[in-house]
């Protein structure tokens, strides 16, 4: 399965459009892509790229014009700082802004440390496969390193995604 199909299926599943039975099965000789391998092929709009080998990947669908998005961004930045201390989670922004310039200005204004892509696949530098007419903002999708869905929902349900991705207490 090529990269565009992988990301498209990930995002279609995210939006509830398809199920595992509707997806194309990889050829026997083709190994499934890990999230690291899939993300490595994405053309980001930011200089920042995701740190490889995270346990979880959070895709945060957001936009500069969305006040709930702006309200939750500081909480996500805070949690990211805590979780990245152990390389536990990587956050990738999927911007619903109209232009790359608007997206970058928003990320700079919030001091976002995240890698970012645009939601539309029509132009270079944008994330392939997102269905903008189905997805809404703010929205979060959390997957593990194999691409298995952990959480999907509204970003303001902060406690839900945090609960599902918080590392267990270390044994002393």
Role assignments for model-derived ranges:
Residues 1-40, 172:
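N-terminal targeting signals for export/organelle localization
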Residues 55, 73-93, 108:
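Conserved helix-turn-beta segment immediately C-terminal to the redox Cys motif
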């Amino acid at each position: 399965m090529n990269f565009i199909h992988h990301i498209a299926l990930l995002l279609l599943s995210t939006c509830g459009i398809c199920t595992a039975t509707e997806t194309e099965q990889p050829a026997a000789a083709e190994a499934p892509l890990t999230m690291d391998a899939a993300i490595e092929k994405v053309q980001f709009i930011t200089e920042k790229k995701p740190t490889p080998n995270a346990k979880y990947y959070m895709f945060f669908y957001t936009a500069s014009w969305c006040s709930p998005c702006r309200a939750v961004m500081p909480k996500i930045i805070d949690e990211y700082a805590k979780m990245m201390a152990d390389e536990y989670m990587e956050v990738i922004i999927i911007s619903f802004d109209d232009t790359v310039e608007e997206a970058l200005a928003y990320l700079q204004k919030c001091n976002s440390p995240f890698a970012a892509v645009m939601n539309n696949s029509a132009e270079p530098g944008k994330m392939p496969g997102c269905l903008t007419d189905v997805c809404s903002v703010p929205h979060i999708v959390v997957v593990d390193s194999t691409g298995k869905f952990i959480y999907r929902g509204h970003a303001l349900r902060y406690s839900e995604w945090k609960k599902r991705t918080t590392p267990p207490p270390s044994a002393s």
